[in-house]
From Swiss-Prot:
Heterotetramer of 2 NUBP1 and 2 NUBP2 chains. Interacts with KIFC1. Interacts with NUBP2. Interacts with the BBS/CCT complex subunit CCT1. Induction: High and constant expression in cycling cells. Down-regulated upon cell cycle exit and quiescence. This is Cytosolic Fe-S cluster assembly factor NUBP1. The keyword Ligase does not apply.
Length: 320
């Protein structure tokens, strides 16, 4: 094929040969016929790489600022409390990587080994990978278009040497963008257990979550359930609960009932969570008796139970 024009949607895109940028391109007829598309060899390479990962979980949110990365980090912390469980946390929020800060790993660098990129370890059984480790400063902006982001995600999935892992948690950017399509495409052959979707109680967040749920249905991504974050504030003195973000349309609970999706739990606001993230420490250690800690632990157990039942079902399907 000849040189592609600026703005080319790509030969494997649904717009191949039909987009505005395709007009006048010498490859237009070839792309429109579908002959220019070829299977990405990375899909098979990633499938092979992921054979050592038992469970793969995506953490999604419709809107930014609802606590998705905080949840991803503490899901990893919670699962890794069992010293026999190997946990990997992959941050694919390319333009806004906050996992290094939350996990206390700012300033760390990625090292190359004979078997690929080595994760940065919080503990012996908790490894982390993020584009933040590739930046010279945490204040550096990542100004990349879709294809370069997709290439980075492909490299993370194919080249990071996690070893044998029980849980791979993928922290995604908000919304339904190139990053989401890429990770679902590349992991499809490797079998994704499902997605956990974060929201806050107010309708302005829920309307974007409904779009996220629609995205999951369209790409056939199983939904483990929804977590309502910042769900009220429980006073540490009087124990009375106040609604900081009133659920004007019933919150995540009503939405989950309407859409027949599991509500995994509600996490109340706790100032210790923000402080722990800024210090790069586990909130569970900072505030073990907090109602938010209890809510997190209940949600994590439900996710663990889902994965175990999912694995048992898969083993039943492939047994002779």
């Amino acid at each position: 094929m000849e040189e592609a024009p600026h703005g080319c949607p790509g030969a494997d895109s649904a717009q191949a040969g039909r987009g505005a940028s395709c007009q006048g391109c010498p490859n237009q007829r070839l792309c429109a016929s579908g002959a220019g598309a070829a299977p990405d060899p990375a899909v098979e390479e990633i499938r092979e790489k992921m054979k050592t990962v038992r469970h793969k979980l995506l953490v999604l949110s419709g809107k930014g600022g609802v606590g998705k990365s905080t949840f991803s980090a503490h899901l990893a912390h919670g699962l890794a409390e069992d010293g026999d469980t190997q946990v990997a946390l992959l941050d694919i929020d390319i333009c806004g990587p906050s996992i290094p800060k939350i996990m206390g790993l700012e300033g760390e660098q990625v090292h190359q080994s004979g078997s690929g990129w080595s994760p940065v370890y919080v503990d012996d059984n908790l490894g982390v990978m993020s584009v933040g480790f590739l930046l010279s400063s945490p204040d550096d902006a990542v100004i990349w278009r879709g294809p370069k982001k997709n290439g980075m995600i492909k490299q993370f999935l194919r080249d990071v040497d996690w070893g044998d892992v029980d849980y791979l948690i993928v922290d995604t950017p908000p919304g339904t963008s190139d990053e989401h399509l890429s990770v679902v495409q590349y992991l499809a052959a490797a079998h994704i257990d499902g997605a956990v979707i974060l929201t806050t109680p107010q309708e302005v967040a829920l309307q974007d979550v409904r779009k996220e749920i629609s995205f999951c249905h369209k790409v056939k991504l199983p939904i483990i359930g929804v977590v309502e974050n910042m769900s009220g504030f429980i006073c540490p003195k009087c124990k009375k609960e106040s609604q900081i973000f009133p659920p004007t349309t019933g919150g995540a609970e009503a939405m989950c009932q309407d859409l027949r999706i599991p509500l995994l739990g509600k996490v109340p606001l706790d100032p210790h969570i923000g402080k722990s993230c800024d210090k790069g420490q586990s909130f569970f250690v900072e505030a073990p008796d907090s109602p938010a800690t209890a809510a997190y632990r209940s949600i994590i157990q439900r996710i663990r139970d889902f994965c175990n039942s999912h694995q048992s079902h898969a083993e039943t399907l492939i047994s002779p």
